[in-house]
Amino acid sequence: MRAYLLGKVLFPSFPTRLCARQVSDEKSCMQFSIQRSTLPSAESHPEEKLYRRLDVTTWLRHLNQNGQVEEEYKLRKAIFFGGIDPSIRGEVWPFLLHYYSYDSTSQEREAWRLQKRTHYHDVQQRRLSMSPEEHSDFWRKVQFTVDKDVVRTDRSNQFFRGDNNPNVEIMRRILLNYAVFNPDMGYCQGMSDLVAPLLTEIQDESDTFWCFVGLMENTIFISSPRDDDMERQLMYLRELLRLMLPDFHQHLMALGEDGLQLLFCHRWILLCFKREFPDTDALRMWEACWAHYQTDYFHLFLCVAIIVLYGEDVTDQQLATDQMLLHFSNLSMHMNGELVLRKARSLLYQFRLLPRIPCSLHDLCKLCGPGMWDSRYIPAVECSGEHPDSRCCPYGGTSTPLPSSPAPSCSPSRGAKSRDIFTFRKQS
């Protein structure tokens, strides 16, 4: 995972001052503080606070007499805004993680569980029946790292606390079996941080395994540390920052390639904010992302929200790349998760108000299906002009070219042409 965890390992506590150079002169130190403990209602999503946490009573209202989920879209919307009561997470999460289909009956789900439990045991048997040569290779590539990770994952959690805790061994088996089930992915450092909360809430080995499979295979929220996956996420995030926080993006541009790598947020994406917020807040963020309400990329709006709320010092003091990494690393466990969630929902709402979006962000709404712009004006796509392998925009984007940088267009323009439309409108 390169040095993604460097800030967390080296700087576990939040300092009151960050020094630009290791010198004794007090004037060489820059002062920092955590601000924005509240969010004005004018900056909130208009439907904020209209939804309560999904409790058992509300959940049962969404189930018909056969146990099928009715009004799935409304359910996901309620989860997006209100979250899920911890007492029913083990029942609801399998739906969000594509283990159960929403239209399955209670009887069908029980039969499915039995079928998948048999499949899981078959996967485990494949691992246990490896030849000595296969096992040696597996130990070197997978098991050695898994064994190191599981013993230090969430050990403060009562569910995993103590020596010889059987739940730690269950987590270990799930991770080893997943590496056999999906050898192309294998095991990546940090997966234990994702499995641990699933096992804590679901508390069944086979069900947890298949929910983890759904998490890894069916949600864009998860990004492996492999370069192509990570770079795609970072490209979208850079474009969102350019659109919504132009001053911060300009600062990144001034820092050059190092700044544009966005090293400070790699851990956010790889570990799904689990190292940045207490479990209570992090799991609420997971649920909001899993709800897939209006976008499959809500985690990127969470990233932008963190920068909006806690990144002002970066531009005010013109922090260098390493200082920026230190600044955001030291915010770990000191940020207001509920505030970040509310701001992210507001950012998504304002993104949907744009009549034109750059083609670089076209895929942010490509897979979400109904909901991103349901019953609303569908925005026109503006070509960024950055398609070296094509004379025309592959997304059919139009452009309002600047004299110095003409961009090709392949279809008539729709919607407003003003480039000012990309200035993020602030609510006040």
Label for each model-derived stretch:
Residues 84, 142, 163, 167, ...:
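Secondary-structure capping and boundary motifs in well-ordered enzyme cores
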Residues 172-180, 192-200, 210-217, 239, ...:
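Contiguous, well-ordered alpha-helical segments that form the cores/surfaces of helical PPI scaffolds
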Residues 76, 117, 147, 168-175, ...:
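Hydrophobic core segments within long, regular secondary-structure runs in both alpha-
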Residues 40-41, 45-53, 132, 207-265, ...:
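Extended, Lys/Glu/Leu-rich amphipathic alpha-helical scaffolds
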